[in-house]
Amino acid sequence: MPWDFNNYYSHNMDGLISKLKLSKTESDKLKALRQIVRERTRDVFQEARQVAIDVRRQALTLESVRLKLEKTNVRYLSPEERADLARLIFEMEDEARDDFIKFQPRFWTQGSFQYDTLNRPFHPGQEMDIDDGTYMPMTVFESEPSIGHTLLLLLVDTSLKSLEAENDGWVFEEKNTCGRIKIYREKTHIDVPMYAIPKEQFQKKQTAADSAHLIKSDSVFESFALNRGGREAYAVESDKVNLALREGVRRWSVSDPKIVEDWFNESCKRIGGHLRSVCRFMKAWRDAQWEVGGPSSISLMTAVVNILDRESHNGSDLTGTMKLIARLLPEEFNRGVESPDDTDEKPLFPAESNHNVHHRAIVETMEGLYGILLAAEQSESREEALRKINEAFGKRVTNALLITSSAAAPAFLNAPSKEPSSKPINKTMVSG
């Protein structure tokens, strides 16, 4: 008989969603790890600022700067990196040094933890990912771009390398767009991309927070950001948000993570609350099929949004909605998946004419998902249906009683989501 999988997907105790969502305890633990990184980063910048103050007040020599840095967390850098950092602080122009002394780093979490689509890992070796950007004012490098670029990289690396040295099982990795600290015991890594924003916009943020007496508290800053006044006060022009790069000729890339965050939040409002759950399910399918690799989370999310924007569907019928997505997903990826951030220069997934072996393998695996869901629906027993659908999402759900006989098809379907009228996106950056 036809089986219905709505409870399989949505039951809050035994269903797939319950196996994917982090508990409050798990979420709080990740926030605590994030806070450790933030506090260390803040401390490292404070140490560097104090040395910069001493250079201005005491007319230190380069050797004196180097010796002072040796007594800080900078000691965890390599000798070459320590020498570079000492030189950068020593050679700062007066205006750049004054601004460096004045401003503190601010933090903004991006990615799945911020979107509320972060799943528990499935295969051994898979990790939860927190992206937590560090932001500093652009005037540090207005006169000489290389100063601000290298300074940010070295100071954030100092933070992560010092944590690596002090915590067993914490491992630093250098990435092109971020520093990463892997925390194996918690199956987690924290990425710290480094951004620069214009001094003027940074000052507006700081003034708004000061006036609300919020500047001292990470948690209060985040609460402030959630209300309308806070978000407006923290607006930043997206073309002024610069991401530091380690590799290649370009030192900076215009990149505002809030573009994608705002796009996804608007998509959830437009399509419905089921969008977040469906994105979680597709990421769970990806994690079950590939121990490493597979389509990126943002490419899956974008493809799902594209499909549900176009196609009539009943958001409360997860069985039907997941079949709809599974049927159309290969075609969506063969067309190519463009980023919702129009500043991205490359597609999230190339069109079929540009596929290599890796891309073709991904689409072939996608093509199998629809068949699995149909076979599960037509299984002879609940137990067989459970075994079959778990081929797609992994053996997370074990209660076959969640699978029920299929009810009549719903009489009313949601119309495809209309394309929203063109309007400026509220692109913000918040300190955490």
Curated annotation (Swiss-Prot):
<keyword id="KW-0479">Metal-binding</keyword>
<dbReference type="Pfam" id="PF21713">
    <property type="entry name" value="DncV_C"/>
</dbReference>
<dbReference type="Pfam" id="PF21654">
    <property type="entry name" value="DncV-like_NTFase"/>
</dbReference>
<dbReference type="InterPro" id="IPR048446">
    <property type="entry name" value="DncV_C"/>
</dbReference>
<keyword id="KW-0067">ATP-binding</keyword>
<feature type="binding site">
    <location>
        <position position="255"/>
    </location>
    <ligand>
        <name>ATP</name>
    </ligand>
</feature>
<keyword id="KW-0547">Nucleotide-binding</keyword>
<feature type="binding site">
    <location>
        <position position="283"/>
    </location>
    <ligand>
        <name>GTP</name>
    </ligand>
</feature>
<dbReference type="GO" id="GO:0005525">
    <property type="term" value="F:GTP binding"/>
</dbReference>
<keyword id="KW-0342">GTP-binding</keyword>
<feature type="binding site">
    <location>
        <begin position="110"/>
        <end position="115"/>
    </location>
    <ligand>
        <name>GTP</name>
    </ligand>
</feature>
<feature type="binding site">
    <location>
        <position position="180"/>
    </location>
    <ligand>
        <name>ATP</name>
    </ligand>
</feature>
<protein>
    <recommendedName>
        <fullName>Cyclic GMP-AMP synthase</fullName>
        <ecNumber>2.7.7.-</ecNumber>
    </recommendedName>
</protein>
<comment type="similarity">
    <text>Belongs to the CD-NTase family. A01 subfamily.</text>
</comment>
<keyword id="KW-0808">Transferase</keyword>
<feature type="binding site">
    <location>
        <position position="344"/>
    </location>
    <ligand>
        <name>GTP</name>
    </ligand>
</feature>
<feature type="binding site">
    <location>
        <position position="129"/>
    </location>
    <ligand>
        <name>Mg(2+)</name>
    </ligand>
</feature>
<dbReference type="GO" id="GO:0046872">
    <property type="term" value="F:metal ion binding"/>
</dbReference>
<feature type="compositionally biased region" description="Polar residues">
    <location>
        <begin position="423"/>
        <end position="432"/>
    </location>
</feature>
<dbReference type="GO" id="GO:0009117">
    <property type="term" value="P:nucleotide metabolic process"/>
</dbReference>
<dbReference type="GO" id="GO:0140701">
    <property type="term" value="F:3',3'-cyclic GMP-AMP synthase activity"/>
</dbReference>
<comment type="function">
    <text>Catalyzes the synthesis of 3'3'-cyclic GMP-AMP (3'3'-cGAMP) from GTP and ATP, a second messenger in cell signal transduction. Is also able to produce c-di-AMP and c-di-GMP from ATP and GTP, respectively; however, 3'3'-cGAMP is the dominant molecule produced by DncV in vivo, contrary to the 2'3'-cGAMP produced by eukaryotes. By producing cGAMP, down-regulates csgD expression and expression of flagellum regulon genes, which leads to the down-regulation of rdar biofilm formation and flagellum-mediated swimming and swarming motility in a temperature-dependent manner.</text>
</comment>
<dbReference type="GO" id="GO:0051607">
    <property type="term" value="P:defense response to virus"/>
</dbReference>
<dbReference type="GO" id="GO:0005524">
    <property type="term" value="F:ATP binding"/>
</dbReference>
<dbReference type="InterPro" id="IPR048445">
    <property type="entry name" value="DncV-like_NTFase"/>
</dbReference>
<feature type="region of interest" description="Disordered">
    <location>
        <begin position="413"/>
        <end position="432"/>
    </location>
</feature>
<keyword id="KW-0460">Magnesium</keyword>
<keyword id="KW-0051">Antiviral defense</keyword>
<dbReference type="InterPro" id="IPR047805">
    <property type="entry name" value="GAMP_synthase"/>
</dbReference>
<feature type="binding site">
    <location>
        <position position="297"/>
    </location>
    <ligand>
        <name>GTP</name>
    </ligand>
</feature>
<comment type="function">
    <text>Cyclic nucleotide synthase (second messenger synthase) of a CBASS antivirus system. CBASS (cyclic oligonucleotide-based antiphage signaling system) provides immunity against bacteriophage. The CD-NTase protein synthesizes cyclic nucleotides in response to infection; these serve as specific second messenger signals. The signals activate a diverse range of effectors, leading to bacterial cell death and thus abortive phage infection. A type II-C(GA) CBASS system.</text>
</comment>
<keyword id="KW-0546">Nucleotide metabolism</keyword>
<feature type="binding site">
    <location>
        <position position="191"/>
    </location>
    <ligand>
        <name>Mg(2+)</name>
    </ligand>
</feature>
<keyword id="KW-0548">Nucleotidyltransferase</keyword>
<feature type="binding site">
    <location>
        <position position="131"/>
    </location>
    <ligand>
        <name>Mg(2+)</name>
    </ligand>
</feature>
